[in-house]
Each structure stands twice: as C-alpha cells, then as structure tokens.
C-alpha cells in the first residue's frame, strides 16, 4: 500500500513540474510559464471603458506605455514578482514589483486618445512613454524617455541615468535630475521648459524661433517673454539650439 501511495505522489509531482503551472495576476490568476524560466509571463485585458488616468508604482520593471488599435486596455508583463491592479472611477492603478534586477518588463497598451493624468513611480528600471496626456509626472532613479507625445504639463524627477525628450510637443516642462544625469531634448516644441541637473550635461534642440524665447542660465531670472527656456547645471555643459 505504501509503495502504491508513493508511486501516486511521484506521478502528481511529475505532472505539476511538466506543466510549469504558476499563479500570477491582478490578485492571483493562474497562467503558464516555461518550466526552464523563473519569469512569469502574463497578458490581461481591462474591460472597463472610460479610463482616462493611469497611476503606476513599480520597481525593477522596465515600463513602456503605448497606444494600440483597441478600445480596451491591455497589460502585459514578464518578470518574477508581484503584480495587481484596481480601478477607481476612471483611474487605473497598477502595482508591479519585480523581485530582482534583470530583463523585466511591464507594457501598458492604451486606446488612442488624450489622457488626463499619468503618474509613474519606477525604481531601478527604465520608463518610456509614447502617449498623449494633459499631465504627466514621472519619479525615477533610472532612464526616462518621453517620445513623440503631446504633453500639457510634464514633470520629471530622476537620479543617475539620462532623461530623453524626443520629438514631443509640450506646453510646460519641469525636469530635475540629481548626480551626473544628462538631460537631452531633441526636436521638441515647447512653450516653457525648466531643466535642472546637479552636475550632468544639458543638450536641448528646440523647434521654434530663437527670438521668441527668453533663455535663462539661472533660476532667479525675471520673465520678459512668454516662452522660456531655463537650463541650469552645477558642473555640466549646456547647449541650447533652435531648428
């Protein structure tokens, strides 16, 4: 009898290992992952319509926010760790913490429209935004990229890695970085932009006429024009040009 019971238990364990079944999702949803990988892979559609604001709290996850050709939100991820979301009114709140540094990613695909607010706090991994939003706030200690987006108000605070603003249209931007963090603004149209770094370089290529802008190299400057570019670095190089 003991021998038969032992054979049954071994058989159950063998099937469990072979299927590679893991549990992972907004609370605890079952999904499958290759047995040779410690990463958990998931893909989840958010059925609620009318979401106009996104809040993401993440750690050790490379975050990307895109548009896609669908009227619902899609969340896809690949990492080992915890993930959940909840919706309050029209706010989608996502939490995604990976257990260790690595090739971790969390991608959020959104219906194509202008969003009211996107707030992203991400530690130890990159953050990349490719959607239009009225108010965008990013707090990080790693690389930040905002590319080909229309932004009403942009605020970025980060350490250590570079910030890249590429081919965007922005009304007002405040970008503050610590340490030797480089700020790059490339082919971007902006009305007001304040760039501050402790010791990194600042390179800004602005779409517009130089004569329309007041350019400041210190914070304490009286405004004489509606359009302002302020660039301040404690030790780094500053280059501002117009195209």
For every predicted segment, state its role.
Residues 1-243:
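Intrinsically disordered, low-complexity terminal regions
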């Amino acid at each position: 009898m003991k021998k038969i019971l032992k054979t049954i238990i071994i058989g159950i364990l063998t099937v469990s290992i072979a299927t590679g079944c893991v549990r992972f999702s907004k609370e605890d949803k079952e999904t499958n992952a290759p047995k040779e990988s410690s990463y958990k892979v998931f893909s989840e559609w958010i059925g609620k319509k009318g979401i106009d604001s996104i809040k993401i709290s993440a750690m050790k996850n490379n975050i990307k926010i895109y548009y896609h050709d669908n009227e619902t939100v899609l969340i896809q991820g690949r990492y080992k760790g915890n993930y959940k979301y909840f919706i309050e009114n029209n706010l989608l709140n996502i939490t995604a913490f990976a257990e260790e540094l690595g090739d971790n990613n969390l991608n959020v695909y959104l219906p194509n429209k202008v969003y009211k607010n996107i707030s992203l706090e991400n530690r130890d991994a990159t953050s990349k935004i490719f959607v239009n939003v009225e108010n965008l706030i990013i707090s990080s200690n790693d690389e930040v990229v905002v590319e080909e987006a229309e932004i009403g108000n942009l605020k970025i605070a980060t350490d250590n890695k570079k910030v890249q603003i590429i081919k965007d249209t922005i009304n007002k931007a405040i970008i503050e970085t610590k340490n030797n963090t480089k700020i790059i603004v490339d082919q971007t149209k902006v009305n007001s932009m304040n760039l501050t770094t402790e010791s990194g370089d600042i390179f800004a290529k602005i779409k517009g006429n130089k004569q329309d802008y007041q350019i400041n190299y210190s914070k304490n400057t009286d405004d004489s024009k509606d359009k302002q570019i302020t660039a301040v670095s404690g030790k780094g190089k500053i280059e501002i040009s117009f195209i």
